[in-house]
Amino acid sequence: MVLIDYSKLSKEVAYALRHAPWEYGLELDAEGWVDINQLLSSLHECEKWKKVSEHDLHVMIEKSDKKRYEISNGKIRALYGHSIPQRIIKEQKCPPEVLYHGTARRFVKSIKEKGLQPQGRQYVHLSADVETALQVGKRRDIKPVLLIVNALEAWSEGIKFYLGNDKVWLADAIPSKYIRFE
């Protein structure tokens, strides 16, 4: 039997839904909703949360002294406290010369062959700085590989980029010819 610290789980979920969904590979809709299975899949990448189930998310909500989350129709959202701007309409933006992406070593071969793909999300998520990219990559691998994306060159050749916030850029699929592996 696995004992779950629901208070710590709530803090993890809050961080994922309110503050840094990009670190968890989550794409919130205009109202902040995300598919529960997507959240669970991301949580399961961390050893501490491998056994968390949808039932545990319901228990977490019930045990809380404040109503922080809502579950409906297979989706979950934080009700308040978001520190990220809601991105309802994504406007294309010219990116900086380079952007970064941290990834697990096990994905490098596929990325070299197919480029960076959204992997079930609407966009590829890129970081404006090395530190953020590596932090994101460490969610899946203790020694992530840093990818350097020649974003301005890709933009000039028709790849679309969108500004998510000051640390995150979104893009359509990026062919491997624009990526350096470090």
From Swiss-Prot:
Molecular functions (GO terms): NAD+ poly-ADP-ribosyltransferase activity; tRNA 2'-phosphotransferase activity
Entry's EC annotation: 2.7.1.-
Enzyme superclass (EC): transferase
InterPro entries tied to this protein: Ptrans_KptA/Tpt1, RNA_2'-PTrans_C, RNA_2'-PTrans_KptA, RNA_2'-PTrans_N
Cleaved signal peptide residues: none
Gene3D superfamilies: 3.20.170.30, RNA 2'-phosphotransferase, Tpt1/KptA family, N-terminal domain
Pfam families: PTS_2-RNA
Alphabetized UniProt keyword annotations: NAD, Transferase
One GO biological process term: tRNA splicing, via endonucleolytic cleavage and ligation
Stated role: Removes the 2'-phosphate from RNA via an intermediate in which the phosphate is ADP-ribosylated by NAD followed by a presumed transesterification to release the RNA and generate ADP-ribose 1''-2''-cyclic phosphate (APPR>P). May function as an ADP-ribosylase.
Family of this protein: Belongs to the KptA/TPT1 family.
Protein name: Probable RNA 2'-phosphotransferase
Record organism: Acetivibrio thermocellus (strain ATCC 27405 / DSM 1237 / JCM 9322 / NBRC 103400 / NCIMB 10682 / NRRL B-4536 / VPI 7372) (Clostridium thermocellum)
Gene name of this polypeptide: kptA
